[in-house]
Amino acid sequence: MKVGVIGAGNWGKNLVKNFLELGVLSGVADPVEANRQAARDMAPSAEIFSSGRDLIAGDCNAIAIATPVPTHFELVAAGLRAGKDIFVEKPMTLTSGEAEELVNLAETHERILMVGHLLLFQPPIQFIKRFLGEGKLGKLYHLHQERKKLGRARYIENVTWSLGVHDIAVLLYLVGSQPRRVFASGHCGLQEKVEDDVYVHMEFLDGIKAHLHNSWLWPTNRRQLTIIGEKGMLVYDEIAATVTWHRKRINDELESIDEGSEVVFEGSGPPLRIELEHFIDCIKTRKAPISDGRNGLAVVTVLERIMMF
């Protein structure tokens, strides 16, 4: 198997490193000479290109794309038409129309299309997915996701596009469906038309609600997911890497029941390595990735709906 990487900058260099360590890196493309030189130093045996199109025209089986989002559509489409399996970093595209076109293209050419929703591959998130599937919380009521800290502010994309993409992917994955209604409210404090602080509310057909708060203008670093169900509650502290099961509920007589709490999962593996190993496995087995093109389309669709507010 041969995997080429297009984009070897800030994040792309991590893809280069991991594919190299996995023994499948064949080439790297980047328009910036400093990034190309860094790739040469890291992977002397890899072919180095200044153009992603040249890498696509080569003999690699698959391509990983870590370039600015506006370039995703053209590069992914070119790769699929060339018969390559594709891994593309989040968000998949700028619009749901572009994302849907890529999904159809991948299906037409029978290619793997995977989107880099990294948090889905955190071991705690995989544990929570199994935990919910076993029905231990009973009927789900609502989910609360927080991702906020001081910085890193951006000039163009708002905090939801920067930080919230991860959380939207997780919420959709855990609920297992697309929201029927989306509401959002944000505040532009540092600059006009770029929200620093955003609240998102989603309603699903089965009555589940999800609430998301993203901010890069916040005094403390907080990354926490809370899930409320009829039989209890889960809290995932991403910083501490713990999942705590609170056996707390309110019964039919509106009495508060507290049967204690326990840490049911602790620790985390390297999600990027797990994610890329999953991509390689999907190429070999031809199974659909956890974060396939339709998953990427669902996330972009929610992002579009948020931007309407």
What are these regions (language model features)?
Residues V165-T242, E266, L272-R286:
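Contiguous beta-strand/loop segments that form the cofactor/metal-binding neighborhood of enzyme cores
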Residues G116-P123, K149-R181, N295-G296:
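Mid-domain beta-loop-alpha active-site segment that forms a flexible
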Residues A34, A46-L105:
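Beta-loop-alpha module in the N-terminal Rossmann-like domain of NAD(P)-dependent dehydrogenases
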Residues M1-A43:
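N-terminal Rossmann-like dinucleotide-binding module
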Residues D54, A62-I65, L205, H278-F309:
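C-terminal helix-rich "cap/oligomerization" subdomain common to oxidoreductases
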Residues T93-G151:
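A contiguous active-site-proximal alpha/beta segment in oxidoreductase catalytic domains
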